[in-house]
Amino acid sequence: MAEIVPTVLCENAEDYKLTIERLSPFAKRVHLDLADGEFAPTKTVELSEMWWPQDWQVDIHAMVARPSLYVDALVQMRPSLVIFHAEVDEDLQPSIQQLKASGIQTGVGLLRPTVPNTVK
């Protein structure tokens, strides 16, 4: 059966809180967008301002230039899945390995112009 997973993209903590509260009565899985304003032109609420109900399954799409700066906090937050982008300027393997060692699933996203077979 298909599952509808709402995406949360908020630029400030107040909007984030309102959105989470609005989704709480019916959502059990959500996709949270995290953007640093460097890798992606938009800057979202900070990772330190993100929270969610304990019974939620959470996927975090981290559109950040330096994923390694976020890994320790992500491990503490315990999302179900973290997606980083292949186009970042650092080796993703250490970050991915740390998340996987903590029981967090990982994924790698591609920007539209990136050809999949060019990713190492």
Describe the residue ranges of each PLM region:
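Conserved N-terminal beta1-alpha1 strand-loop-helix module at the mouth
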Residues: 1-83, 87-91, 98-101, 114-120
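Short glycine/serine/threonine/alanine-rich loop segments
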Residues: 104
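Active-site pocket-lining/capping segments in soluble small-molecule metabolic enzymes
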Residues: 107-111
